[in-house]
Each structure stands twice: as C-alpha cells, then as structure tokens.
Amino acid sequence: MSISIGALVLVMVASSSQDDKIQTLQKLVHELREDVAELKNQKNETWLNQQRAEEIRSLVLEVLSDADTRYSMRGDGVLAGYDGGAYLMSLDENWKLKINGQLQVRWLYNNADRQASQRGFELRRTKVIFSGYVVDPSWTYKIAATWGRAGGSNTEDAWIAKKFDNNQWIRAGQFKAWFLRENIISSSKQLAANGSMVNNAFTYGWVQGVSTGWNNEDVNLFVQFTDGPWSFNTNALGPSTNAWIARAEFKFGDAGWSDFGYLTSKIGAKDGLLIGVAYENYNTDTAGGFEYGNANADESYGWTIDASLRGDGWNLFGYVVETTGKDTVTGFEQDSSGWLIQGGFMVNNNYELFVQYQNGEINNAVFATGSSEMSAFRIGINYWPVTGSNNLKWTTDVAWSHDSLADGGTVTGNGSADWTGTGNGWRQDILNGDGQMLLRTQLQLLF
C-alpha cells in the first residue's frame, strides 16, 4: 500500500514537472512566432523601399532621356532669361531675340479760351518690340509694331544693321531720323508725358532709307539719306524725294552714351555733358511739298544745336532749331524757329520734379486765327513706384500757353503752323483766343 502511494506521488510529481516544461515551450513558441512576424514585416518594408527606389530611379532616367531628346532637337541649345527685356539666345551667342513692350495709358484735360473744354482717356502708345542679332552679334535688327489710338496697327522701326570692327556701322530700312535730339530720345525715356510743340513742328519722325555712322567713347557721327520727313510705311513708286541729315555729338564727363539715352537722371547717376549739332536738307517732286518746319515746302534746309547736362539726381536739357522751307513753284519762302529748355530734380529715389519752357516763331506769318508765335510753360512730377526700376512710371504735368495757337496754312505764303496735335494734347485756338491749359496724367509700363 505504501509502495503504491509512493509511486503515485512520483507520477504526480513527474506530471507536474512536464506541464511546466510544456508551458515554457508554448511560451517560447509564441515568442518565436512574434519574432518571425516582425522579421517578415521588416523584410516586406525593405522590399517596398527597394521597389520605390527602383521606380524613382526609372522615372529620373526617363525624364533625363526626354530632356536630352528635346535638347538634341534644339540644335546647339537655347539660353533664356531677362536682361532689359525677355530674351532667347543660342549657346554660342550668335543668335539672339529680345522682346520688349511699351504701354502708355493717359488721361488729359484741355481748357481753351472761347472753346468747350475737352477731356478723356487714351492709349497713347502700345508697342511690342523685337530686336537682337543673327549669324553673329555684328548683324543686328529691330522691328517695332504699334497699335494706334483709333485702331489698326502700324510699324515704326524695321531695319537691319551691320557693325564693323572700326566702330563704324551701316543701317537700312525704317528708323528714327536723327535731327532733333528730343525726338531721338525714346518716348519711354522723356521727362514730360509727351514731346513738345517745338518737336511736333520740326521733327522728321520715322523715315525710310539708309544711314551710317562712327563713334568712340567721346564722339558720335551720323549721316542719313532718306525719303524725307515722316516717310515711314510708304512704297518706292511715287514722287521722288532726296533728304539728308548729318549729326555730330560730343560727350564729356563720366556718363556713358547709354546714360544720355534718358532725359531723366536718377540719384547716383554719373555726371556728364553732351553737345549735339545737326543739319537737315530735302527736296521733293511731291506736289505742294511736305508740311515740315511750319511750312508747306518742296525744299527745306535747317540746323539745330542741343545740350544735355546730367548729374547725381538732376538734369538740364535745351536746344534751338531753325529751318527755311521753300515753295519753288510760287517762290514763297518761310523761316521758322523754336527753342526749349527743361530741367528735373530727384526729391528722393522715387519722385522727380521738373519744369519746361518752350517758344517758337513763324516769321512774318499771318493766320486767319492764331498768332505767328508760340510759348508755353510746364511743371510736372514723375513717380517710379519701384525704387531702382524704370518698368513702371507715372507722370503728371500741367502747362499753360501764352499765345493764340495757330494751326494750318497762312493767309498768304507757304507758312503752315504745326505746333498742335492730338499726340501732345494742344488744340488750335479759335477766334484768336489766347489762353489754353493742358493737364496730362499718364501711367507707363515697360517690359
């Protein structure tokens, strides 16, 4: 009996020990399963990361291949950017296209003696300009397309030029005449909102022909042979005209030629003086000739002298011009002259105040209404919203004329007053009215 009980105790002890081992083994198996599951997850994540890396690598190679294909289709490649205008240029720098634009939005008010006042908005200038060079930088070109205030498009500049190693150049096509310096300066770089009445009467405007010149650091020489004043956008067939302009400019001081391309001078600008002299002469077979220099003439000759002085935040500019127009059929001869002086001063980096006075005379001319003389005084302000940038400019000026402004032909002779126009905002005075006020405010955008 005691033996049986002892055996049973031994069996029970052995069974209890075996259960503990089983539980330990089960716990170990469970832990191993967890470890295996964790290892599997880590393996899957590693595989997914490798798969993503392969996909990204494949995508990058595809993009690079496409870029290389596009690059090869463009020949030697193209550079693009903005430097005084948006441009495209070949990698060898032998081909370049630059795109610029000009937009002038203007409101004006004109109050003339004995007439109803007039006011309104206009798009004074809307231009898109293409320029650059082809073959190599010595072959340059410029095409300027404009849209008129009354609708329709037009062309101002359209020329091809060649530069030579000796600082000489030649140009053919349609371009500005280089007689009056006020007209030579771009409309986007003037001091006032628009050109003066003197400029309106004596400028040649845009012409067709050929021109050549030479320059160094201090001297600029020009000669132009054209079809005469305002001969742009015309054809070759018709009455013949021979017109010559010769101009010389002399520069002194630290300011460069490009600095004198502006009639304003910002704070920090270099000092300089430019003196210019020019001569014009034309003869035409056109019946009645042209209206130029306050005369209807088939022959004309004239001269001008101008001076531009600029410094650190200030500028002065003035010129005098005189022409003689002949009608060879009737024998009439008309002398006319004009002069202008103006100056500006930067109050700070954004504001400029300016004044201007202009005067003109049509010698011994008699008009049905209006005077043979012209004079006007102007004050104004320029505002550049962005310091150091010329892309945006707001100009406001107000002027008063002191003489009765004539327009058109004289009672006798070949005189023809040409002071006024819709471009500058002045009107012909009627009934010998002698007081006129002109207010202009203009926002300009350049790109």
Locations of regions flagged by a protein language model:
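Intrinsic disorder/low-complexity segments
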Residues: M1, M12-A14, G413
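Outer membrane beta-barrel
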Residues: L79-S231, L237-L274, Q334-A365, S372-F377, ...
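N-terminal periplasmic/intermembrane-space "pro-region" immediately following the signal or transit peptide
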Residues: A7-Q102, D254-F260, Q442, F447
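Short linear motifs centered on Gly/Pro in flexible linkers and helix caps
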Residues: S15-S16, E31, Q190, K393, ...
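General helical structural elements
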Residues: L25, A37, I56, L61, ...
